[in-house]
Amino acid sequence: MPIILFSPSLAIFFSSDDWFHLRVSAITHLSEFSNFFSFIRNPQSIAFYRPLTTQVFFFAFQKLFGVNPTPFHIFVLTCFAFSLYLIFRLSKKLQKTNEKALICTILYGFSVSNFTRLYFLSAFQEVGLVIFSLLCIESYLDNRKYRPIIFFVLALLSKETAVVTPLILFVLDWAKKKIEIRKLTPYLLVLFPYLYLRLFVFGVVSGETYVWNPSPLKAANTLIWYILWSVGAPELLVDYIGNGFRPIARFFSDFPGWWPIILGLLVLNLTFLGYLFAKKLGRFNRRFASFIVLFIISLLPVLFLPQHKFTLELGLPLVWFCFAVARLLPEKGKILAFFLVAYLTLNLSMNHLTYARHYSVGRGVVSKKVFEYFSKNYSTRPQNSYFEFINDTRVYTKEWGSSRQIANSVGGSELFRVLYRDQNYNVYYEDFLEVRPALQRIPISSKIFLQ
């Protein structure tokens, strides 16, 4: 059922960062493939070190299927289905019953926070991270010797937030009252060299959204948002909440029909979870406490980045959230039925709202129009001239003109670099005051792609 819920993603075209990743991964030599995994910056490097789930992913599917996003999406959904199977298996191992495992899988599978991870192809790294992290954890709990280390390395190659895995394993051992530091040593021997190479050789990402803020209050605010998103709040809600968690006036005008549904269902779910938590207060064991701690630990890489909070970061943390909620719920009966109805109603309705508002959908539509237009009308790049998208509609603000909307959808010049197979090809946008080349200008209407 969750696969059916997110199956509309199959129709979503490439957009934004997808084009950059397609361009970088379009290699022709074996040495370029090895560049994917190098910690030394090179032409095949991207902003983050995620070679397995980004460069290799885009390279393999582009090589097999060209610029056709459907096979990419089929693979992503297949991996998501496999991650649900792994969640069921791990939950059964930790919570001992099929009923609890099924509850966890339902909660995770229908969560609206999965939207970005499944609709935006460049977010596939989160799905890969979840798969390899869960395989590592399960193999570790089964006392496998080498397999969990291999999966840990694959998780690190998927996304850097896998660095919390050894700490997750430590907490799971603590929950069993059986901590073996020697057993964790191999993970540290992998982790410390990785951290050195990742931070000091590959380097860190700069930018306003990646500035660390050690403020406990900011971290608490960020944690609250990840909890709200885990319950089912739409990601867009963060843009409409002011000081004291009060909705700003624009929230009610932008969502006249939706705001009662959003707030009503969210409050209902939070109230019911609060009731279940209070009901079991004082009767919690180490296992439940470990799930709460693991939720926070999994968020540590982003918890102190208040300007960089997004639902796609919930891939691994959501696993522990669902485990904790399942721990609060009975295995059958009216209470379970009531909560599942409330939870599914919130998340299914927010999935519908998110589809109508999410950038991956809107930008995908624009990007497809641009790609098809230029494939038909300019299948070969014109000589001694350049394209410039102009602002020919007043629908958008001065700061976010129509040409900027196009630029955000196609990744600036990246779509054209893929289309014309030229790593250095540039197009221009009226909103961006760049120096134009001394060539003939070909103005392109932005309006025709935004209708």
Please describe what each predicted stretch is:
Residues 1-451:
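Polytopic membrane enzymes that build or remodel cell-surface glycoconjugates and lipids
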